[in-house]
Structures are given as structure tokens and as C-alpha cells.
Amino acid sequence: MQLFHLCLIISCSCPTVQASKLCLGWLLGMDIDPYKEFGASVELLSFLPSDFFPSVRDLLDTASALYREALESPEHCSPNHTALRQAVLCWGELMTGCSWVGNNLEDPASRELVVNYVNTNMGLKIRQLLWFHISCLTFGRETVLEYLVSFGVWIRTPPAYRPPNAPILSTLPETTVVRRRGRSPRRRTPSPRRRRSQSPRRRRSQSPASQC
């Protein structure tokens, strides 16, 4: 707990441990869920095991490769882009603070505690945030929410009554693609009518020429 107060002193600019305790009490008194406005929740994300999420480095590389132009743009693209920007900046500031703590702590054991705490606790939260918003931008928010619900139902079902393999996010959009393909013939039905309607016009245009 003292280590957490030390992080609060650095990140929240609290001058003393007592002030950091007051800051901690204020933070814990607020019911803030970063996923609420997107239709999800921290509890829903907690159904996914910690080893499910890629490393922060892999997630940052993915975000940079797919959405770097939009993330660096001064324009507002979407709420997911904004949240992804904030998560990336938060991780950068956290790494800067940890580097400062590591350079100023002479005790190797204390430095190791800081690194382990950041990687196991704060690192997991950042990985969850990055994965959620990257997935929403890649597959669509509704698809991600459907996947979280499906995985939550699967993981809470006894092994004897559930499929052997967990749901896979990348396979969910295929069902929507199939549905769209099923609707496509209905959209294509007017095309023969257009061809039939065009044929009399051609005959009418040709009839004066034949009379002449």
C-alpha cells in the first residue's frame, strides 16, 4: 500500500503520504467505469483471462499500424479513437513516472516492486483498454460486445455443458457477412426490371429510324 501511495505522490502531485491517502479516498468514492459509455463494463472485461490480452507493446504496434493517422489527427474521429489516445498517453506517462522512480530508488528490491506492480496491475488495465478500443475500431462495437457476452456465458457454463473451445472474436463478423450476403439478392431484384424497362425504350428509339 505504501508503494501505491508513492505512485500517487508522483502522479497526482500529492506532497505527502497523508495527502495521497486523501486523494485515494476521493478516487475510491467515485464510481468510474471507463467502459460504461461503450456499453461494456469492467466486470464484463474481467471474464477474459489476463493471458488473453496481448502485451502492451504488441497492442501499441497494432494501434500505430492501423490507426496512427487517425490518432495523430486533430479532428475528432470517434469516442473509441479518443479513448485509445488517452490510453496510449496514460501508458507513456506511467512509463515516464516509473523510470523516474526506478532511477531515484537506490534499493533494488523497491525498484523491482515498482516494476512488478505496474506490470501486473496497471499494465493489465492498460492492456484491457487498448484491446477493447482497438477491437471496437477493427470489428465494430456491437461485435465486440456480442463477443464479451458470448465469452462470459461460455466461461460461466460448466465444462460438461459447454463447447470445448471458447468463442473467437475474428469469427463473429463472418456471420454478419453471411447475413448481408443473404440479403443481397433482394437488393439485386430491381436490376432485371430495369433491363426490361430499358428494352422498350430502345425499340421506340429504333422505330422512327426504321420508318424513315
UniProtKB/Swiss-Prot annotation:
Keywords carried by this UniProt record? Disulfide bond, Host nucleus, Host-virus interaction, Repeat, Secreted, Signal, Viral immunoevasion
Q: Where is this region: Disordered?
A: 165-212
Q: Where is the composition biased (Basic residues)?
A: 178-205
Q: Which GO terms describe its cellular component?
A: extracellular region; host cell; host cell cytoplasm; host cell nucleus; T=4 icosahedral viral capsid
Q: Which InterPro entries match?
A: Hepatitis_B_virus_capsid_N (IPR013195), Hepatitis_core (IPR002006), Viral_capsid_core_dom_sf_HBV (IPR036459)
Asked if the record carries the keyword Disulfide bond, the reply is: yes
Supply the SUPFAM superfamilies for this chain.
Answer: Hepatitis B viral capsid (hbcag)
Q: Where is this site: Cleavage?
A: R183, S184
**Residue span of the signal peptide, if any?**
1-19
* Positions of region (3 X 8 AA repeats of S-P-R-R-R-R-S-Q): 184-206
What are the start and end residues of each sequence repeat? 184-190, 191-198, 199-206
Q: Which GO terms describe its molecular function?
A: DNA binding; RNA binding; structural molecule activity
What exactly does this protein do?
A: May regulate immune response to the intracellular capsid in acting as a T-cell tolerogen, by having an immunoregulatory effect which prevents destruction of infected cells by cytotoxic T-cells. This immune regulation may predispose to chronicity during perinatal infections and prevent severe liver injury during adult infections.
Q: Which family does it belong to?
A: Belongs to the orthohepadnavirus precore antigen family.
Name of the protein in its database record:
External core antigen
Q: Which organism is it from?
A: Gibbon hepatitis B virus subtype ayw3q (isolate Hope) (HBVgbn)
> Which taxonomic lineage does the organism of this UniProt entry have?
Viruses, Riboviria, Pararnavirae, Artverviricota, Revtraviricetes
Q: What gene codes for this chain?
A: C
